[in-house]
Amino acid sequence: MVIIKPMIVQVHQSGYRLDYILSKLLPQYSRSQIKHWILNKKVVVNNQVSTLPRKKVVYGELIEIKYINNNDICKSEDIVPQNIPLNIIYEDNDILVINKASNMVVHPGIGHYQGTVLNALLYRYPSILKISKQAGIVQRLDKDTTGLMIIAKTVSAYDNLLRSFKLRKVVKEYDAIVYGKFTSNAGVVNQPMRRHFAKRTFMSVHYTGKSAVTYYSVVEEFKAHSRVRINLKTGRTHQIRVHMAYINHPLVGDQKYKGNFSVFDIKKMSDELNNYLLDFNRQALHACTLQLLHPITQVQMKWNAPLPQDILQLIAILKKY
């Protein structure tokens, strides 16, 4: 068991989020790891368990972290460089753009200590952890979402990219295959999101959440499914998956959010199609376009990544019926 000394909130820390303050007090641990501890009742504030990462701390409060096992910890210095192939789309002295494969976590965390994008980056760029705790990673894609990611290779590029994302100056477009057909060719989902009250690894639409805006347009329609192009104004965790499920068009293969849509309009499907959909083992989501000003040269940059083979095969089968 790892013992972490109790901490007292100082005057200048009062009013900040619990997860933020802990990430500053414990820089050797990632923020996602700290959130994991909070959500799993490992953090105690003034003798009361706190399960809200967004809880605002107050001057003088005592923060304790209890019962942390060695298996629950992944420190930055423990991340192992691994010779893992990366599909590099673009690279210069300041940035790197990759086309992430499916079944690949971006950053090590609970249950995923190896085989991540960061493990691969450390192998190619051993000093990249000096840029930040996130090792130059300024955006994330879900484990099973494929497509474009930009990574900073210098501190200046990292800071400028973070600023661009915060100011929403980065264009991110996605291709998705969803259940159902739409009544209009384009639309917007403007619904706030927050962590689910009961299912703590889920996100949900809720009026107390943070602003989340998703634009979509129909690219292609099939008998009981659609291919849509999605543009994000905000970048909340699982935003596309949650918003599309909210409007009753969940992503094909999304085991987490599609609910009962595994049998959506099953009468319209052949056995071959139905079996293929049931076996499609990831959300059909691909980050296809990334556009921004280069963080150092300020030149307009744009990258496109073609659809991966599994989604192309899915589209081919959908076209047959």
From Swiss-Prot:
GO biological process assignments: enzyme-directed rRNA pseudouridine synthesis
Domain S4 RNA-binding: 16-93
Active site: 142
Keyword Lyase: no
EC numbers on record: 5.4.99.23
Domain of life where this protein originates: Bacteria
Localization of this protein: Cytoplasm
Gene3D superfamilies reported in the protein's UniProt record: Pseudouridine synthase (3.30.2350.10), RNA-binding S4 domain (3.10.290.10)
Major site of localization recorded for this protein: cytoplasm
GO terms of molecular function: 23S rRNA pseudouridine(1911/1915/1917) synthase activity; RNA binding
GO cellular component: cytoplasm
A Pfam family annotated for this UniProt entry: PseudoU_synth_2
Alphabetical UniProt keywords: Cytoplasm, Isomerase, RNA-binding, rRNA processing
UniProt catalytic activity: uridine(1911/1915/1917) in 23S rRNA = pseudouridine(1911/1915/1917) in 23S rRNA
Job of this protein: Responsible for synthesis of pseudouridine from uracil at positions 1911, 1915 and 1917 in 23S ribosomal RNA.
Database matches in NCBIfam families: PRK11180.1, rluA_subfam
Family under the similarity heading: Belongs to the pseudouridine synthase RluA family.
Name recorded for this polypeptide: Ribosomal large subunit pseudouridine synthase D
Lineage: Bacteria, Pseudomonadati, Pseudomonadota, Gammaproteobacteria, Enterobacterales
